[in-house]
Structures are given as C-alpha cells and as structure tokens.
A protein has these predicted regions:
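An amphipathic alpha-helix signature
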Residues: 35-36, 50, 54, 74, ...
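Short helix-capping segments at alpha-helix termini
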Residues: 42-46, 87-94, 121, 145-149, ...
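Short, acidic loop-to-helix structural element flanking the phosphoryl-transfer center
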Residues: 74-75, 92-128, 135-138, 166
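A metal-dependent, Asp-based hydrolase signature
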Residues: 41, 47, 61-97
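Asp-based, Mg2+/Mn2+-dependent phosphohydrolase catalytic module
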Residues: 2-17, 117, 124, 129, ...
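Active-site neighborhood of HAD-like aspartate-dependent phosphohydrolases
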Residues: 9-58
Length: 237
C-alpha cells in the first residue's frame, strides 16, 4: 500500500481543518510498550498477552456500551488484564501492578514529537480525544513531555460512554468550539476512524498494522501508515 492515500475520491476537506484531534492509545502512544518493559517477568507469551490485553480492553468497552454499563477506562483496563493474566496462568500480583503502572507512562511513537511540532508551527490547533479517563491520560501525557502541544485532552468520561458513541465525538464541538467539518480526526483504530467520519469529522486512519479496512459506516478521508505522513497530507511544510 502507499504511505498516504485518498479514500473517498473527493477534493480533500483536510486542507480546511482548523484542529487535529488525535486518539491516544495506539495512535500517539504505543500500548505495547507496557508489556515490552516487563517482558522478562511475563515470559515467552509476552507479545500474545499484549495483543489479547488490547483486544479484550476494546471488546469490554463495546460490551459495556451495549449494556449501558459505563465504567472508567482504568477499571476496564484492569479487568481486561486480569482476564489475560488468568488465560496465561500468571498469578504474580506484582506483574499486574507493574503492567498497570506502565500503562500510565506509555511511550509515544517515535515520529510523534516532531510531527506535533510541525503542525503547531503551522498554526494548527491540537487536541486528544480518548477512551482513557483523566486519571490515566494526565500522567501519561505529562510523562511524555508533550502536554504543552495540546490545547485540550478530552476524555469520554465527560460523556459517560465509550467510542464510537456520537456523544464522545460531540465533546470536541462542545469543548473546542469548532464545527465537525473543521476537525481532522486521527485514529489507528479503524472502527474509531469510521465512527468519527460517520459523525462528520474529516478522518484519517493511521493504519500502523497494514490491516484491511472495516466495512462500517463513515467514509474515511485518507489512510496513512504512521503519523510522519500527516504534515504532508495537510499541506504543512
């Protein structure tokens, strides 16, 4: 695939974007870095556990949305981890504590700081919209030394529901005072990208895994392999 591609065949709405709103986990921050730091304590199943943890974490948010049973993402993350530790027979509570602690200081992807600086210099507003609750997001963004790049770090906690419920994307309108058609939304989660596009954002799928598209409502504006390609997509020098 190409590093950057148009998806809808129409003149790009991205050029008129006033604000770039980023998903956090998997888009700006590498959720696999939590397990990577403690690989020795987990053993040969570390990569499989990391994949299962993320899959269960997202699955639980969808199921809770369907049940009308919202809980903070920190709780959901712990519940998903407990399932995975049980699945791989890991009973050491210290491993659980280390992994959850690492989740509060995930590594940003390598291209992220320079990319944000380029967008900021070009006059674009920057924000985060995440399933994470503030008690998770604030320490993570702070540890990354990227907090000053963002005018807002928005959490679904304010809506009491997880992505891709439209109430989540509406937070950007309410908090940032911008129309949906002026928002460039970026997510590595294809279902999140489609949800945001269906809401009305101009959406870029950051397809880090080179995965096939999901057959969901909402037309994506573009697809890129990582965020290093975003400035060029937006016409930023």
């Amino acid at each position: 695939m190409t590093h950057s591609s148009r998806r809808d065949g129409k003149p790009s709405a991205l050029a008129g974007a006033e604000i770039c709103v980023f998903d956090a986990y998997g888009t700006l921050f590498d959720f696999n870095s939590a397990v990577a730091r403690h690989r020795a304590a987990i053993g040969p199943n570390a990569d499989a556990l990391s994949d299962m943890w993320r899959s269960k974490q997202i699955q639980y948010t969808w199921l809770r949305n369907g049940m009308g049973a919202y809980a903070k993402f920190w709780q959901v993350t712990g519940e998903a981890l407990d399932h995975c530790l049980a699945a791989y027979g890991i009973k050491d509570a210290g491993v659980r504590d280390k992994l959850l602690g690492a989740y509060l200081a995930l590594d940003p992807f390598a291209e992220v700081p320079a990319m944000l600086d380029r967008l900021k210099r070009a006059g674009l507003r920057l924000a985060i919209l995440s399933n994470g609750n503030p008690e998770m997001l604030d320490p993570m963004v702070g540890a990354s030394k990227l907090a000053d790049r963002f005018e807002a770090v928005l959490s679904v906690d304010a809506a009491g529901v997880f992505k891709p419920d439209p109430k989540v994307y509406r937070l950007v309108e309410a908090r940032c005072g911008v129309r949906p058609d002026k928002v460039c939304f970026l997510s590595s989660n294809c279902w999140d990208a489609h949800g945001a596009a269906h809401f009305g954002f101009s959406t870029v799928w950051v397809n880090r895994a080179g995965a096939p598209d999901d057959n969901l409502p909402g037309v994506l504006a573009a697809e890129i392999r990582d965020l290093s390609h975003l400035p060029a997509l937006l016409g930023v020098a």
